[in-house]
């Protein structure tokens, strides 16, 4: 099995830019192996929300750290961005921070793309997935060097070159919520990304088998694929604090169809805040006992995931990092 890694999710929707950078730096100081960041033009909620630019955060944290792996979880390189420009940006970061950068990609959400000018009805999954695959092909062709002509269904290049590229390009991690994209991740991604709290059968019967199938079709060793999961966990020795911390992140407990189709953070906030706290908690591991926390997290390792990235919902992130380093990290490391 691939190496066990522990990571920190920097919540760009919750914290202002300077604080978000300081948290990324603190993640390395507290022993995390990676720090990932979301890429939102608009946050999940209007009141108290933030949405700093992910690539600015990565470079700022990269300059102040030495070893931690940095990446997006995730970015959509297909609508408000031109994938060639994203390829250039990540190639530059790959040169600045060798072997420390990855590009995590997904198919996109209306919340971020409609406000920035996407015209017409929000595309169905089939088109969004096709755009994603094409953008990955385009970026990799650019990273191979030489001049590139590319005539795709959605994107075109004419004599394009990226002049500063790290050897081998940049690892691409592909986010999947279902088996079709998971199979693609196994076939074409250096990494695979999913999120926690969706029921054992999704991971054991759909996602992980699909990743393995995709790897087999491509003749790849599945152990070479970094299998990342964002674990939504509210850990605090105070049970009431652990529960209250999750309220800010109620939008994550909405159905996938709602999250993908709502394009206004004010509406998103209104719909999410109508959810009872008990329903919000179903998406989270809400715990006060470290052994219980590790037992519930450990099931994901048993199911085949090796890179555990922790999304803590509370406003006091330094407290979480301190508690994680003291109470959870030593226990979790033993799982590997």
Swiss-Prot record:
Q: Which InterPro entries does the UniProt entry name for this protein?
A: F420-dep_G6P_DH, F420-G6PD/mer, F420_G6P_DH-rel, Luciferase-like_dom, Luciferase-like_sf
Q: Which UniProt keywords apply?
A: Carbohydrate metabolism, Oxidoreductase
**Residues noted as binding coenzyme F420-(gamma-Glu)n in the record, renumbered to the chain:** 39, 76, 107-108, 112, 177-178, 180-181
* Superkingdom, natural source: Bacteria
- What Enzyme Commission number does this protein have? 1.1.98.2
Q: In the UniProt record, does the keyword Oxidoreductase occur?
A: yes
- Recorded catalytic activity of this chain's protein: oxidized coenzyme F420-(gamma-L-Glu)(n) + D-glucose 6-phosphate + H(+) = 6-phospho-D-glucono-1,5-lactone + reduced coenzyme F420-(gamma-L-Glu)(n)
HAMAP family registered for this protein in UniProt: F420_G6P_DH
Assembly, per entry = Homodimer.
Protein name listed in UniProt: F420-dependent glucose-6-phosphate dehydrogenase
